[in-house]
Amino acid sequence: MNILQFNVRLAEGGAAGVALDLHQRALQQGLASHFVYGYGKGGKESVSHQNYPQVIKHTPRMTAMANIALFRLFNRDLFGNFNELYRTITRTAGPVVLHFHVLHSYWLNLKSVVRFCEKVKNHKPDVTLVWTLHDHWSVTGRCAFTDGCEGWKTGCQKCPTLNNYPPVKIDRAHQLVAGKRQLFREMLALGCQFISPSQHVADAFNSLYGPGRCRIINNGIDMATEAILADLPPVRETQGKPKIAVVAHDLRYDGKTNQQLVREMMALGDKIELHTFGKFSPFTAGNVVNHGFETDKRKLMSALNQMDALVFSSRVDNYPLILCEALSIGVPVIATHSDAAREVLQKSGGKTVSEEEVLQLVQLSKPEIAQAIFGTTLAEFSQRSRAAYSGQQMLEEYVNFYQNL
């Protein structure tokens, strides 16, 4: 079996983490695997390119730049295709799995991707198409994240915000949504198998394209994180006031980090110590420690290991790996109500809470937080969580899925 993983980024973001981990685990088990990614920062080669075997940067910088510039007007990516991979794929001996992840974000023209898949399937029938949906892009006219909007259910008539990712100047989603959905139907007709790590994304997809069209395989922590976990000593009790973590790539974005909630935690003063991990922190106070964006996973996990809890208030994530990672090292997660957080926490027996409850819980000790959220002791919660988010289990489910197609 030959597997090609496709994702817009190589090592940035949750979808990239899943795709890259599947690629590395497949290689480790002796399967033939390559990872094709769109571009790195600024349209250049990813800074992580040399760190991984069998990876291919796909998109010329000018193509990405043109898509970025024109998307704000057209609401779709005008350029980008897989045509140069046609000969490589069709001349490969034996079955080939083309496993797509995030194909949007200024990378590829969707219609060109569908036409490419048609051409490849006609030439080489033993090509299997798999697409993991890491967001809601497959059901909307434009947006990757719904952020509470349900306009996609009625054809994206009028977008409530032009700033929702990916942002635009002119709203054309209502003009594009029918054609976009037709292209997904054509992928289904080609036998493409759709998967999502999240039940709520799968439910949205199935409501449009038919019952059972999208199946569930939950995300798991990656190999690098598993190696780090093996070396981290469990921290049962911390000294002093509760240490509370807030983690996001860009801490200014209210969709990922509820700004008002963080300020209310800051207002608790010397009752807690608030630690932020991410770029552009707007939070400054005597009880706040801003660590900045930590690219070294080992350093981030080591720092989180010292925390009493992680507060998660995102409205735009679908199956956030940071929750799996924090829970796997025995750090309780205090999450506000969202489909994504509810789904992840339920896997280890946890629950989401209201914003008012967050402000009470962050003042408790680590064992008390574990008891309140997970209904058990800190030791039992840690053991349960370590088993719940296994990356090896994720790979086994995917490989089993590939082989059964």
Curated annotation (Swiss-Prot):
Signal peptide: none
Presence of the UniProt keyword Transferase in the record: yes
GO biological process: colanic acid biosynthetic process; lipopolysaccharide biosynthetic process; slime layer polysaccharide biosynthetic process
Pfam families: Glyco_trans_1_4, Glyco_transf_4
GO terms, molecular function: UDP-galactosyltransferase activity
Pathway involvement of the protein, from the record: Slime biogenesis; slime polysaccharide biosynthesis
Zinc-finger in keyword set: no
InterPro entries documented for this protein: Colanic_acid_synth_WcaC, Glyco_trans_4-like_N
Keywords, sorted A to Z: Lipopolysaccharide biosynthesis, Transferase
Domain of life from the UniProt record: Bacteria
Protein name: Putative colanic acid biosynthesis glycosyl transferase WcaC
Organism: Escherichia coli (strain K12)
Gene: wcaC
